[in-house]
Amino acid sequence: MKKLLAVILALTMVLTLAVPMLAAAEAPEEITILYPGEETDEMSAFLNGAFAEKVLSELNMKVNFRFLSWDAYWDQKSVMLAAKEPIDLYWDGLPDLSTMVNKKEAQPLDDLIAKCWPESMKEILPESQMAGGRINGVQYGIPSAYAPSSGMYQFVCLRQDLLEKVGMTEVKTAEDLREFALRVQEQLPQFRGPADVIFKPLTRNFAEEQYTWVASQDLVVFGEESKKAYSFAHTQAFQDVAKYNREMFLDGLYQDEVAIKYNERDSRMQTGLYLWVEGSLGKENEIIGSVKTADPEAVLKNYLLQPEKPRYINATGGEVLCVPYSAPNPEGAMKFLAWMWGSQDNYLFCLYGEKGKDWDLDENGRLVTLSETARGDGYFYEWMFRNANYQVFSADVSDEYIEMYKHWDDAAVPSAMLGFAFDNTGFEAIETACNEAWKKVEPILFGYVDFDENYPAALAELEAAGINEYVAEVNRQLEAFMAK
């Protein structure tokens, strides 16, 4: 009897210890994603409902989101990362990856990828795509938009319906854009003009050779033909763009907000009251749902100014996902990405919601949106996670457009600086000073202040900050990179 009691007591103790251990083993892991934009009621309902249930069921994971408004995203992101707040994954522009690495905002991902990603991910994000997220051979970011990319930052996405309504059919030059804005101002005064100063597409229009931005922010450009770096503010193209934009302001074609709230340009365009915004390949399809919600008659179309000029492939897309050093669960972040891109169903679920409720595919594999949210912005940003393996088009997108889209890069020229990342070691103070001086340059570029009155002093301040030494170092590193 005593032996039996001892056995029972022992089993009781084992079970007592085992239950919390089993509970702990089954507890879901958590990650936190820093995400740009406003959290809508629809997004909250999705994240707390169908999305939460699916990732818990399939990943045993809870995914938290911290939203930052577009106008504050970059400044607040830097503050949060510097304060080592518990963020596991965040988005930024791929051209700024080297800056983030220099600021110690992005940790190496090679070991995490090897541990957390299945072999199948090499087909979803191939080697050629992943190479764009490497600096000195180390993977610091995931180039998250896998799609054709030549002519990046050089498109203008405009209201084609309004263009035709005022008697025009297409635009090819900056003067065509100006004429469009003037006609709308005269004939359709209820519209508020352009949503964006589009300084990069305008640079394509005015520059003698095509420029690609390199190093930190907008300080330096790389000449695709001369294969040298230049201070953008010192180029003739800068002066031409600034003077063009100044005329647009003086003629009442630009509203003050396009300069003082530059980062809200996409939000403005989606109100249905504006004429154009900087585009990207496919942007007309990407934002048309939101624009049509505001103006059901809206039709969008993308244009390249000076279309006869060459197009360059200078990056593997424009978006990058990074894991900060302070991430509490970096493995969880990588597991989540592998899950999201693991199948077309998961991918479309994240973008558009529940199949059969928010969206479906017709017999031809075309996207059919069923809910107002799916017809508008969707849930996860399509442009941020776009993947050519899974991308679908709605039935109103022509077969001709899809073929053009798929073969867009066929005639493009790979840039000599493709894969280059500037290392600012030893130049951190100069870079910071130049970016501070750029705050005086930017209003000139946007046309918000008079060129002749402000340009000489702003240029002198930029030079005093060390822009010439900075450009010389960029050129030194570029020469070494291109010599490999």
Predicted regions, residues:
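Extracytoplasmic/secretory soluble proteins
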Residues: M13, L17, L22-K484
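Positively charged n-region of N-terminal signal peptides that target proteins for export
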Residues: M1-I8
